[in-house]
Amino acid sequence: MFPMVTQFMNYGQQTVRAARYIGQGLIITLSHANRLPVTIQYPYEKLITSERFRGRIHFEFDKCIACEVCVRVCPIDLPVVDWKLETDIRKKRLLNYSIDFGICIFCGNCVEYCPTNCLSMTEEYELSTYDRHELNYNQIALGRLPMSIIDDYTIRTILNLPEIKT
């Protein structure tokens, strides 16, 4: 065949292919047009976290036996446990316990392996500060229970559950 005819056929095939790709993109775009938005207006709306959400660690000072299991299982040796050996009763007495949330990776190993369940994960995830030294929580700060976002009437909570199609 003539070279001009083959070039014209290639041009026609490329035009049809381009139109098909544009049509596919248009169909995908239009299918998303009738969906609800996924974004939330953050300070005024918050998602309800899942049951197993790994937020800030809560610490109960009275339950801790200073066994240091949390330090041994932590991949970055993060919890700082200060204790004193009471020689008369041959037990450790906990003096200080602190975690630096600027370094913590929230893996949950300390909570999982704690033999006395003195550590637990909370639903609190707003830990941002202007000074990184404020992220070093001692046993008093770790012992505070977070305010539940469900109880806060100024914030609209949004349940984050996947839709079940029937």
Swiss-Prot record:
Compartment(s) where it occurs, according to its Swiss-Prot or TrEMBL record: Plastid, Chloroplast thylakoid membrane
Methyltransferase recorded as keyword: no
Binding annotation for [4Fe-4S] cluster 2: 74, 104, 107, 110
GO MF annotations in UniProt: 4 iron, 4 sulfur cluster binding; iron ion binding; NADH dehydrogenase (ubiquinone) activity; quinone binding
A Pfam family recorded for this sequence: Fer4
Membrane topology value: Peripheral membrane protein
Reactions the enzyme catalyzes: a plastoquinone + NADH + (n+1) H(+)(in) = a plastoquinol + NAD(+) + n H(+)(out); a plastoquinone + NADPH + (n+1) H(+)(in) = a plastoquinol + NADP(+) + n H(+)(out)
Annotated positions binding [4Fe-4S] cluster 1: 64, 67, 70, 114
Domain 4Fe-4S ferredoxin-type as annotated: residue spans: 55-84, 95-124
Database matches in InterPro entries: 4Fe4S_Fe-S-bd, 4Fe4S_Fe_S_CS, NADH_quinone_OxRdtase_chainI, NDHI
Gene Ontology cellular-component annotations: chloroplast thylakoid membrane
Primary residence: plastid
Plastid as UniProt keyword: yes
Function: NDH shuttles electrons from NAD(P)H:plastoquinone, via FMN and iron-sulfur (Fe-S) centers, to quinones in the photosynthetic chain and possibly in a chloroplast respiratory chain. The immediate electron acceptor for the enzyme in this species is believed to be plastoquinone. Couples the redox reaction to proton translocation, and thus conserves the redox energy in a proton gradient.
Name of the featured protein: NAD(P)H-quinone oxidoreductase subunit I, chloroplastic
Source organism of this protein record: Hulsea algida
